[in-house]
Curated annotation (Swiss-Prot):
Belongs to the class-II aminoacyl-tRNA synthetase family. This is Glycine--tRNA ligase beta subunit. It catalyses: tRNA(Gly) + glycine + ATP = glycyl-tRNA(Gly) + AMP + diphosphate. It comes from Rickettsia peacockii (strain Rustic). Its EC number is 6.1.1.14. Pfam families: DALR_1 (PF05746), tRNA_synt_2f (PF02092). One of its GO terms (molecular function) is glycine-tRNA ligase activity. It is found in: Cytoplasm.
Length: 664
């Protein structure tokens, strides 16, 4: 069996694109090989400067095959038949016909001759290279090929020989290159083993998994050796794997003078900008040490460490300067600057958004002065030097600046946490922070939907689905008893376009997100039966109804409700129950129980005691069963029949006070 080796050698490929490219090219090559009946074992390796394909077990020749291509029917217009003939370069007389569903159709038999595999590989390879779609790609120079970064070389070897192939301006050869910094020289290779070994000798580890294992092991061992803790950060690990061809883990130290900076600034500088790993002591406290991944061998580790510490110091010096500049101004004094920052083209600036958030906070919690102060100042840090340089520190810098100004801890914490939660795994804020976060998210949700930014399909550029889930989690986890319908009305009225159409759109969207949230724990029919805009009530009802319907009595009662509902059907029952028309004991007993429990159920619902309400409904089971077993609803006397239908209507209405049982 044969072996194919292909390397696309380029300028630096973005780290976050490499893993997807590895998986994408693997799928593409595998599929194209199979389409050509080449059943090979395929591997793809992605690194900072190369995408490599290794395929084994390729046949030396492709077998001849025939493929039938269906054409038009023999009764089709002559132009259609002639077009089919022209497409396949045959005359009508040469085309066989086949009977399909009592209709004759022309067919063309496409024959593929036996070919040597090396003859068809170049066209297959070029097709596969072009088929992968990078998230971003580019042209360069005067060349017509397009790729993620400029391609510099193509290595292509089949069974130890260069496979003649041209891709754009590049002609395939048997050359690769070693490590960019230390061994950037031409390496002639003969096959995959030779290729992998020569790369390793020249400080390039081909396999992504090996580089990842080296980094993870190095991080853990070096942290442990200094009795420090490194927090799991798979995303950063994946990124540095894509930045290094020959990774070596080293430990550095933050200069003492920068430790006066907030730890979040230090962490952001190291993680986001420098791709360093922060270290903590065994009690979880931040330490002045960090780990980093060096790309390539070196003779003097201390020199490499000093170089990285120097780069970090330069960045932290900027941060320290920005911090000192920022604290020269108060958060209040920055409000005017927010007028120059657009929230949305149709919704005005951030100063206007602040005013709406403040109004919503005042509506939710009147006379809460700390909350109102936090609402006024919560966006001020967006125009600070620090947040301009480190956008991920929004809210956090506002917290530190508020503390520096002497504002109380409740105000500072609300400013810090009002962006939370930013996903299902993020913590939900509490206290004033929860109310401020709710107001901010609600204003964004309402405003952006009024502006026509409602999510469609997979598109959600303003993360409104996440905003809605954040609102839901804040309400539920803080047990906020809110009239959400009134709250949405209030928020909508803060905008000029407060139409009923917009309100209905927002409520419908919010209800769908609530269903999405609850469906992890509850059946969708159960959710539909109890969902309303009071999420606390909804949650209580879901718990009680789920437990109730697990029991046999609950299942039997639901069946009794459905039977009553089916008998009524689409009939409009308007008359009251007339006890004087009862002629049997079962209907008398049933009516007596209904009259007895109706006010108790209403009181239980008012008290939000849904378990009691369901238990009261259970007392209907025996009389309902007796009624259905012994009574014919459609009596020959129309008055009696109508009265019995009214009785069943009473039952259904009583059930529906607790939940929409018709949706179960």
């Amino acid at each position: 069996m044969s072996e194919l080796l292909l390397e696309l050698f380029s300028e630096e490929i973005p780290a976050f694109m490499q893993k997807n490219a590895e998986e994408g090219y693997l799928n593409i090559f595998t599929k194209i090989f199979e389409e050509n009946e080449i059943f090979a074992k395929v591997q793809v390796f992605a690194g900072p400067r190369r995408i490599t394909l290794h395929a084994t077990h390729l046949p030396k020749i492709t077998l001849p095959k025939e493929e039938e291509i269906k054409g038009p029917s023999i009764e089709a217009p002559e132009t259609a038949i002639n077009g089919f003939c022209k497409a396949h370069n045959v005359s009508k007389l040469e085309l066989p016909t086949k009977l399909i569903s009592n209709q004759l159709y022309y067919f063309f038999v496409k024959k593929t001759e036996e070919r040597e595999i090396k003859e068809i590989l170049p066209e297959i390879i070029i097709e596969a290279i072009n088929k992968y779609s990078w998230a971003k790609s580019m042209f360069w120079g005067d060349y017509k090929i397009k790729w993620i970064r400029p391609l510099r070389n193509i290595l292509c070897i089949f069974n130890g020989e260069i496979l003649p192939m041209q891709f754009g301006h590049l002609t395939a050869n048997n050359i690769t290159y070693g490590h960019r910094l230390t061994d950037n020289k031409k390496l002639e290779v003969t096959d995959f083993e030779d290729y992998r070994n020569k790369l390793l000798e020249n400080h390039v580890i081909l396999e992504r998994a090996k580089r990842e294992a080296i980094i993870k092991t190095g991080l853990l061992e070096l942290a442990n050796s200094h009795e420090l803790i490194i927090k799991e950060d798979n995303r950063l690990v994946e990124e540095v794997v894509g930045l290094s061809e020959f990774p070596i883990v080293l430990l550095g130290k933050i200069p003492q003078k920068f430790l006066e900076l907030p730890k979040e600034v230090l962490i952001s500088s190291m993680r986001t900008h420098q791709k360093y790993f922060c270290l903590f002591d065994k009690t979880g406290n931040f330490t002045p040490y960090f780990l980093f991944v060096s790309n390539g061998r070196f003779t003097n580790a201390e020199l490499v460490i000093q170089g990285n510490e120097k780069v970090l110091s330069a960045r932290l010096s900027d941060a320290l300067y920005f911090c000192k500049q920022d604290i020269a101004k108060t958060l209040e004094s920055r409000l005017g600057q927010l007028e120059a920052v657009t929230f949305h083209a149709k919704l005005g600036n951030l100063r206007e958004k602040i005013e709406r958030i403040t109004d919503i906070c005042n509506y939710i919690a009147p006379n809460n002065k700390d909350l109102i102060t936090a609402a006024r100042l919560c966006k001020s840090d967006l125009v600070s030097e620090m947040v301009w340089e480190f956008p991920d520190l929004q809210g956090i810098m506002g917290y530190y600046y508020a503390k520096h100004e002497g504002l109380n801890a409740e105000i500072a914490a609300a400013i810090k946490d009002h962006y939370k939660p930013q996903g299902l795994s993020d913590n939900v804020p509490s206290g004033n922070a929860a109310l401020l976060a709710l107001a901010d998210k609600l204003d964004s949700l309402v405003g952006l939907m009024i502006a026509g930014e409602t999510p469609t399909g997979s598109g959600d550029p303003y993360a409104l689905r996440r905003q809605a889930l954040g609102i839901i989690r804040i309400i539920l986890e803080n047990k906020l008893e809110l009239n959400f319908n009134d709250l949405i009305n209030f928020s909508i009225n803060l905008y000029k376009d407060s139409s009923d159409e917009n309100k209905n759109l927002i409520i419908s969207f919010f209800e769908e997100r609530a269903k999405f949230y609850f469906k992890n724990d509850y059946d969708i029919a159960l959710i539909n039966a109890v969902l309303d805009l009071n999420l606390i009530d909804t949650n209580f009802k879901l718990d009680e109804l789920k437990e109730f319907l697990i029991e046999d009595a609950g299942k039997q009662l639901l069946n009794a409700y459905k039977r009553a509902s089916n008998i009524i059907g689409d009939q409009k029952i308007t008359g009251l129950v007339d006890a004087s028309l009862f002629s049997t004991q079962p209907e008398k007993e049933l009516f007596e129980v209904i009259q007895k429990i109706s006010p108790e159920i209403i009181d239980s619902i008012a008290d939000k005691d849904y378990k009691k309400a369901l238990n009261l409904l259970s007392s209907l089971l025996t009389p309902i069963t007796s009624f259905f077993d012994n009574i014919l609803v459609n009596d020959s006397d129309p008055k009696i029949a109508q009265n019995r239908l009214s009785l069943l209507q009473n039952i259904c209405e009583l059930f529906d006070k607790v939940a929409k049982f018709n949706r179960l």
